[in-house]
Amino acid sequence: MGLDSLPPSRSTCWILLVFGTAVLAAGCGGPFLVFPGGALRGEVVTEPVEDWSFADDWFVDLETRPSDPYSVELNYVVKHRDLFLDPAEGRRWFDYIREDPHVRVRFGDKIYPARVVLVGRPGELEGFPPDRFVYRVESRTE
C-alpha cells in the first residue's frame, strides 16, 4: 500500500480547513465570520447619514485604524435614528477606536465614512449591557 492511498489524518483536514477559511477571509474585502479583515470593499456613500434606521442587518462591518485598516463584524443597536456600538473590554478594535475615532461602517455593499463618539461608560445608559462602553456612530465625509 503506497502513501498516496492512505486517508488524510485529522490534523491534515484541520490544516486544510483553517487554510481554506483564511483564503476565503482574505478575499472578501473585510471581516469573515469571527476572523478580522482589512480595508472594507464596496461603494463609498459620500452623503451624510442623518437617520440610521435603514440598518436592518444582523451585523455591521466596522473598519478601524485608517492607517492600517482592521475590520470586524459585530452587533449594533439603532435607537432614535442613531447607530450605537457597545464594545467589550479587551477587543482589539476597541483599542483602535480609542486611539483614532475615524471609522467606516458597511451595510451590504455600501460603506459609510464615520467617526465614533463615546456617549456612555459602563452602567450609564439604559438598554445596553452594564459592563460596556457605548459609542454613537456619526456620519462624516471622507
Task: Outline where the language-model segments fall.
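Residues embedded in well-ordered secondary-structure elements
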Residues: 17, 51, 63-65
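Bacterial N-terminal signal peptides
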Residues: 14-25
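Bacterial N-terminal signal peptides that target proteins for export
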Residues: 3-16
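Short, structured beta-strand-loop surface elements
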Residues: 46-49, 68-70, 90-142
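Post-signal peptide N-terminal segment of mature Sec-exported envelope proteins
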Residues: 37-58
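Short beta-strand segments
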Residues: 55-89, 115-117
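Juxtamembrane/interfacial segments flanking transmembrane helices
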Residues: 31-34
